[in-house]
Amino acid sequence: MEKRIVCLAGDGVGPEVMESAKEVLHMVERLYGHHFHLQDEHFGGVAIDLTGQPLPQRTLAACLASDAVLLGAVGGPRWDGAKERPEKGLLALRKGLGVFANVRPVTVESATAHLSPLKKADEIDFVVVRELTGGIYFSYPKERTDEVATDTLTYHRHEIERIVSCAFQLASKRKKKVTSIDKANVLESSKLWRIVTEEVALRYPDVELEHILVDAAAMELIRNPGRFDVIVTENLFGDILSDEASVLAGSLGMLPSASHAEKGPSLYEPIHGSAPDIAGKNKANPIAMMRSVAMMLGQSFGLTREGCAIEEAISAVLKSGKCTADIGGTETTTSFTKAVMQEMEEQALVGRGR
């Protein structure tokens, strides 16, 4: 297989974890005979320094012409006083790509379950599917005076249907359960959300559907996270709940994410920030970035075997006791990456010997 991938290293630790992603992709090429054209483009703060814009037209054009986009990290205090904020580039990139579904898997490795703030953390394995383009962040009118401020929460039927369909498609390949989170006891938008969700569910008779109000869902994520398989919710609720859920893994350096469009390339990135305090020190945890690569291989390219090989190698290295400082170890970004690559190679040799 031959694919073109645009690499947006971005800011802070972004270039370091992006290098890990590239090395893992090169290992996949070598072990499985694929070829990936990796194209570096400027994005975020570094793009502001060079062009005055966080998302140059050249970068967006390259992303639109690609098969997938990998993003390292964006932002940092260096640009706090800048006319353009690096984070604006991320919003513009999402809009330019037309991505509407943010997918965040939340899993806890048995080797790192002790880092989670919860007991029985090794039972956690669910996915949050968040709608990205509608809701209160993007609805109008928005206005503010000294005395009153107004935001508008609007959802159209087609926006709800496509995000809920995405969740059901994902659940049909997992444990076959969708939890839809809303505030249908108060909000008209949530009432429509629930109606449309019920209609979509009829097309997936083998997938269980449950509805939970957002306040109860926030409690259940802490009290009983093992009950969830695929969570689907609107933009604001998803923003809050996905961040709450990410804490369960014990480190932001562990979790990947994907943002999908109806057509065109998807965007893959770790959920952690740019971590400017450790940038350039070879201390960043590359796991979330490598898992983002694994998601890309499976979800955009259909290379499920190759994506699983990366995940299995990461798990094996963690079980061996090797990990970076954020999860209690002494490995560097580069040494952990090398350990994962070596494990991938060894597992491939074992597989061929069977």
Curated annotation (Swiss-Prot):
Q: Which SUPFAM superfamilies match?
A: Isocitrate/Isopropylmalate dehydrogenase-like (SSF53659)
Q: Which residues bind substrate?
A: 94, 104, 130, 215
Q: Where does Mg(2+) bind?
A: 215, 239, 243
One of this protein's Pfam families, by short name?
Answer: Iso_dh
The cofactors named for this UniProt entry are: Mg(2+); Mn(2+)
Q: What is its EC number?
A: 1.1.1.85
Subcellular location, record wording: Cytoplasm
Named from the GO MF annotations, one term is: 3-isopropylmalate dehydrogenase activity
Residues that bind NAD(+), according to the entry? 76-87, 273-285
In which domain of life is the source organism classified?
Bacteria
Q: What is the catalytic activity of this protein? A: (2R,3S)-3-isopropylmalate + NAD(+) = 4-methyl-2-oxopentanoate + CO2 + NADH
Residues the UniProt record annotates as site (Important for catalysis): 137, 183
Establish whether keyword Oxidoreductase is in the entry: yes
UniProt keywords, alphabetically: Amino-acid biosynthesis, Branched-chain amino acid biosynthesis, Cytoplasm, Leucine biosynthesis, Magnesium, Manganese, Metal-binding, NAD, Oxidoreductase
Question: Annotated pathway, please?
Answer: Amino-acid biosynthesis; L-leucine biosynthesis; L-leucine from 3-methyl-2-oxobutanoate: step 3/4
Single GO cellular component term: cytosol
Looking up NCBIfam families in the UniProt record yields: leuB
Similarity-based family: Belongs to the isocitrate and isopropylmalate dehydrogenases family. LeuB type 1 subfamily.
**Function of this protein?**
Catalyzes the oxidation of 3-carboxy-2-hydroxy-4-methylpentanoate (3-isopropylmalate) to 3-carboxy-4-methyl-2-oxopentanoate. The product decarboxylates to 4-methyl-2 oxopentanoate.
> What does the subunit section of this Swiss-Prot or TrEMBL entry state?
Homodimer.
Name of this protein: 3-isopropylmalate dehydrogenase
Q: Which organism is it from?
A: Bacillus anthracis
Q: Which gene encodes it?
A: leuB
